[in-house]
Regions:
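Predominantly late transmembrane helices and immediately cytosolic-facing juxtamembrane segments
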Residues: 1-4, 65-105, 171-187
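Acidic-enriched, low-complexity/disordered segments with a strong bias for Aspartate over Glutamate
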Residues: 1, 17, 102-105, 138, ...
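Membrane-spanning helices that line or support transport/gating and their immediate boundary helices
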Residues: 1, 5, 9, 13, ...
Length: 187
């Protein structure tokens, strides 16, 4: 799992045993911090990651089966996940340095490469969910199980549809525009 690889990279480079010993590591390990951020977004279920697609399917299935309370409990679980991962992100990567960071370096390539590959796959399969869902659908159909209405760019389930590619493009435009606007305002 992406988050476990990231924790291993931080432990290798810092030799820290507790979160309290860390802080500000993101300045020295930006690739590791980026990979953690992508993994955290997926765990919480934020578009355009594959975590959102997974949670979308679960929420839609629960709603279709008349289980809105279970859908709400699942959503609350995602909010709790957001809280502890945000705390971890701040404590390890963004907070005040817990000690001297001069000796800390980015994770070695042998650790960075799998993290970057996994982070890339989290985003690619989130933007194009049909890459994984179409073969899964075929397997479900072989066993007579209900399948999803899947396209390369998204899916339709029960009362809703999800076009992951369109949402990813809109998010890119929105965040890119906001970043340019902020840069313009600050200069």
């Amino acid at each position: 799992d992406l988050l476990f690889l990231m924790v291993g990279a931080v432990m290798l480079r810092t030799h820290a045993d507790t979160i309290e010993e860390l802080g500000g590591v993101g300045r020295k390990m930006p690739v590791t911090m980026f990979c953690f951020f992508v993994g955290a977004l997926a765990a919480v279920g934020v578009p355009p990651t594959n975590g959102f697609t997974s949670k979308w399917i679960i929420y839609q299935a629960l709603m279709a089966e008349g289980q809105p309370l279970l859908a709400l409990i699942s959503l609350i679980g995602s909010v709790i996940t957001l809280a502890y991962l945000a705390r971890f992100m701040h404590a390890v990567f963004l907070g005040q340095p817990g000690r001297n960071l001069d000796h800390i370096e980015e994770a070695p390539l042998v650790m960075r490469a799998p993290m970057l590959l996994m982070a890339g796959m989290v985003i690619v399969t989130g933007v194009f969910p049909g890459l994984l869902l179409a073969p899964l659908n075929d397997a479900l159909a072989e066993y007579g199980m209900p399948s999803l209405d899947v396209a390369f760019y998204g899916l339709a389930t029960g009362p809703g549809a999800w076009n992951a590619t369109a949402v990813a493009v809109l998010m890119l435009v929105a965040f890119g525009g906001a970043g340019l606007g902020l840069r313009f305002l600050l200069t």
